[in-house]
């Protein structure tokens, strides 16, 4: 007749997976019950690995069969599987009420021009506004804001930077931190760290809105910003031509995947009015955006004409909302700022700005 000693001796032949000691020596055998031809075993192991449990179950069952056990009740207890940490909202700029991402699927569509004039138009509404030039590979904001020759200012501790002021807007750009014309040849991690530092190591103070001029595309910079602060709005800048609209769709798709509320689309350079004959020409075509608007449940936030004064203002550091406040484009930026402000109020009321669902998670599990 089978005894507990017989069972223990058989269990001493069961080596714990990936180790050299048996499960009896480890102290994993917690209980043995014998009743007629039935055997009950309670084994407790420190691993939550399903593979480890399966190996032990197979080896123990085989050993007990060889001992003549006909009915085996084998209970292998394991610790709970490690749970991924619950995602939480991350915010490196808690003094800023709203962060707005100005994006484009491609370069050369007027993204920086939009960022500059929108920022000033928001400031003209008596809001505290910051403008962050996150386009580290092509920082045009210093020139467009008339700051290309300005020196950066350190705070008394010498550890943080104070934004420069222009037209009522607090401004910071990588273009202020290295020589004009110097190229940056950075890999993704360096770019990501730079964007985080421009949020945490700049003394922005209490802002109502921070407008962020992004690099073109949908890469590391956009993901880093979205994970670093809850974004209240995403704005895509495009031109009416089909290839630009294709890229605008990618930008809108990025907003959707990163849970960024979409404020709308800015259609830039939609038409040109000749100053001499007053004839209007659609240089880039007049392709409809209705499919984009419907697919992403958004609106055209502004339709800007191709106005020479806009380009001249950017080159001279005199944005059109300042140099020609009564121009067609300036009035459009003014209306755009009002509409964006209303959108941001809705985002705040409905608590739509949250980045907890896009935070990186990492789970560590012991397999032995």
Swiss-Prot record:
InterPro entries: FSCA_dom_sf (IPR034904), MIP18-like (IPR002744), Mrp-like_CS (IPR000808), Mrp/NBP35_ATP-bd (IPR019591), NUBPL-like (IPR044304), P-loop_NTPase (IPR027417), YlxH/NBP35 (IPR033756). It comes from the Bacteria. Keywords: ATP-binding, Hydrolase, Iron, Iron-sulfur, Metal-binding, Nucleotide-binding. ATP binds at residues 105-112. One of its GO terms (biological process) is iron-sulfur cluster assembly. One of its GO terms (molecular function) is metal ion binding. Gene3D superfamilies: Fe-S cluster assembly (FSCA), P-loop containing nucleotide triphosphate hydrolases. In the N-terminal section; belongs to the MIP18 family. In the C-terminal section; belongs to the Mrp/NBP35 ATP-binding proteins family. Binds and transfers iron-sulfur (Fe-S) clusters to target apoproteins. Can hydrolyze ATP. Homodimer. This is Iron-sulfur cluster carrier protein. It comes from Helicobacter pylori (strain ATCC 700392 / 26695). The lineage of its organism: Bacteria, Pseudomonadati, Campylobacterota, Epsilonproteobacteria, Campylobacterales.
